[in-house]
Amino acid sequence: VRKSYIDPVTTYEVNVMGTINILEAIRNSNSVKSAIMVTTDKCYENNEWEWGYRETDPLGGHDPYSSSKGCAELLIKSYQKSFFNNPSKSPGVSSVRAGNVIGGGDFSKDRLIPDLYKSINQKSKLFLRNPFATRPWQHVLEPVSGYIRVAENLYNAGSKGNDSWNFGPHIADIKTVKEVSELFCASWGINQAIEFHSDADHPHEAQTL
């Protein structure tokens, strides 16, 4: 999200034009039977609600990253209606939306669990920007198992199965950044030095997802 403020043009090029390029490849293929388009839970117009967003809620987004994902969702919906609409011939195409997925192989910038591990390994303090921001944390195997089920259903149902799907934890399992940090450190049996601070000049980030 923060990188999209620095380079919004590339953000839109990748997430919007990248999506349309994939959709065009599917449209011009004779072999694709089903496809899932992975976007994000940030594609919704975020009103800082305490409850989860539904697949029918308005798309949008405050920051360029979220907005670009909303645009990608609109493209997918347009292609579903315009090109992937023949029940007997069209491939099944659906979007799937998940957020704050954690698991092995995650080396991206500004990721809580990798940053916690690095600070523990380097015996350095970890600075967290939004300790009380809540996120729908889930292990990568949870949404991936759902994605596979959606793909299987699309393969069998074709374009009749076209839709959009949210994947996330039960609302009772949603934790703040602070809670996840403390749970992670406790599981390692480590009293890690964590400092929480906010920056008035920091770009907007949603408190509740």
Regions found by a protein language model. Give the residues of each.
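Residue-level signature of the cytosolic catalytic core of signaling kinases
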Residues: 68, 105-109, 173
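C-terminal structured domain segments across diverse proteins
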Residues: 55-57, 68-69, 93, 114-128, ...
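C-terminal substrate-binding subdomain of Rossmann-fold SDR/epimerase-dehydratase oxidoreductases
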Residues: 100, 120-209
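Residues in well-ordered alpha-helical elements
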Residues: 2, 9, 20, 110, ...
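Short aromatic-enriched loop/helix-cap "lid" or pocket-rim segments at secondary-structure transitions
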Residues: 47-50, 106-110, 140-141, 177-180
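N-terminal Rossmann-like NAD(P)+-binding domain of SDR-like oxidoreductases, especially those catalyzing
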Residues: 1-98, 102, 182
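A short, amphipathic alpha-helix embedded in the catalytic core of nucleotide-handling enzymes
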Residues: 22, 79, 115-120, 146-150
